[in-house]
């Protein structure tokens, strides 16, 4: 952006971002991102984490969710995280950098999980947004379908699935699909999620055998 003026929309986004109380709190607390607060709100309402759990974190960078989950599962727990972008190390987190859509990366991720099942699969994945819902929503739905497929492969009976979804075409069908696989499903809009954002979080607990 050197030598060019920022667009009005990007300037508005930056102003909103840095004046956001959750961004400011995250900076004060030394947290990786404001996403920490979203997962904290979900944990307070749905109690998905317990000490000793194994957790898969998809779309993990910069590490807000992994950073929070570590505090809940303790030293006896384990987190296997994956993202296309790099992520600074977090004690207790086994991080794999790569594109989750790539078969080799997926295979490496499954190898890290191993034969034992996990108790939580969580996904904060989102595509690069262009601002056109007709393009953005299908891209986002593709990622959440992949996350659900991962949960089918690795989640233990009784386990939980937490996924960020953008409301739009395909959302209702996706929600029905999740309801067929879990005993309890809630749609959450945390206070720390920006009001104008289409994002919501589906919290599914009690994976059916």
UniProtKB/Swiss-Prot annotation:
EC numbers, comma separated: 2.1.1.166
Active site feature: 164
Alphabetized GO MF terms: rRNA (uridine-2'-O-)-methyltransferase activity
Pfam families per the UniProt record, alphabetical: FtsJ (PF01728)
Extent of the signal sequence: none
Cellular-component GO terms for this entry: cytoplasm
UniProt keyword Methyltransferase present: yes
Keywords: Cytoplasm, Methyltransferase, rRNA processing, S-adenosyl-L-methionine, Transferase
Localization of this protein: Cytoplasm
Gene3D superfamilies registered for this protein in UniProt: Vaccinia Virus protein VP39
Sites where the protein binds S-adenosyl-L-methionine: 63, 65, 83, 99, 124
Keyword rRNA processing: yes
Coiled-coil segments: none
Family in the record: Belongs to the class I-like SAM-binding methyltransferase superfamily. RNA methyltransferase RlmE family.
PANTHER family: RIBOSOMAL RNA METHYLTRANSFERASE, RRNA METHYLTRANSFERASE 2, MITOCHONDRIAL
Function: Specifically methylates the uridine in position 2552 of 23S rRNA at the 2'-O position of the ribose in the fully assembled 50S ribosomal subunit.
Listed NCBIfam families: PRK11188.1, rrmJ
Protein name (database record): Ribosomal RNA large subunit methyltransferase E
Biological source species: Klebsiella pneumoniae subsp. pneumoniae (strain ATCC 700721 / MGH 78578)
């Amino acid at each position: 952006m050197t030598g060019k003026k920022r667009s009005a929309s990007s300037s508005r986004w930056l102003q909103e971002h840095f004046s956001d109380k959750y961004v400011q709190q995250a900076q004060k607390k030394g947290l990786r991102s404001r996403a920490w607060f979203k997962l904290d709100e979900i944990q307070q309402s749905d109690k998905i984490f317990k000490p000793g759990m194994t957790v898969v974190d998809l779309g993990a960078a910069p590490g807000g969710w992994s950073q929070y989950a570590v505090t809940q599962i303790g030293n006896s727990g384990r987190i296997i995280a994956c993202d296309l972008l790099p992520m600074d190390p977090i004690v207790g987190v086994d991080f794999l950098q790569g594109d989750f859509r790539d078969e080799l990366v997926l295979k490496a991720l499954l190898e890290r999980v191993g034969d034992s099942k996990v108790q939580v699969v969580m996904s904060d994945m989102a595509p690069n947004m262009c601002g056109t819902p007709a393009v953005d929503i299908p891209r986002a739905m593709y990622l959440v379908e992949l996350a659900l497929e991962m949960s089918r492969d690795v989640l233990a009976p009784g386990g939980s699935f937490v996924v960020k979804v953008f409301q739009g075409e395909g959302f209702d069908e996706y929600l029905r699909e999740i309801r067929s696989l879990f005993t309890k499903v809630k749609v959450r809009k945390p206070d720390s999620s920006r009001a104008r954002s289409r994002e919501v979080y589906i919290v599914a607990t009690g994976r059916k055998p």
